Amino acid sequence: EKKGHKPTFPSFKALQWIYLATLDGRELPADVQAANAYLMPLLKKEIKNQSLYEKALTAIILSKTEPKLAAEYVQSLKEYTVYREDMGRYYDTPRAGYSWFDYKIPTQTVAIEAMQRLTPADTETITEMQRWLLQSKRTQAWDTPINSVNAVYAFLQGSNALAPQALSVLKVDEKPLELPKATAAIGYVKTNVPAESKTLTIEKSSEGTSWGAVYAQFMQPS
């Protein structure tokens, strides 16, 4: 402003600062409160011109003071998504942001966080967003420590994912498999099935996203 430029939206660093202060929740010093009081009204200006990452951060910040407006921002975030059964729900727009080392992970994780805070009952959309995040681990990886932490947070926030849950039931040709105890940490299980078996079925009763892999090994007669 000293140079004659009147900002219409907080800078990227200022936006991240307000976000962190919102999450922390502690009372701020008087001078910092004054700075925040200046920045907060700017969050409601020119939001249509901001990236989806910035819109998601803004929704989280406003969730405590203006939940109705924040919910409108989250609805906008949902309207920008596209859905594929195999990939889940994700952003296919330049407004989602992209870089060679981050891919679109930052936008996806902060959008999930905003949805978890403001529309926790919409588990279908959140789960579909998480599915894309998991699929990106396979194809693009979570290449930085920050992306990895944010991705894990996006899966665990607002859920009891680490609580004991019913195990999935594996069946071969409709007959339940008796499985040995899984190895610690990775949950690896090895068992033998008849060579003439045809169909493997996995039945899951717990909530949330589950993932795993099946490896088949056999001896070829000489």
Residue positions per predicted region:
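Long, domain-scale non-catalytic interaction/scaffolding regions in large secretory-pathway
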Residues: 2-222
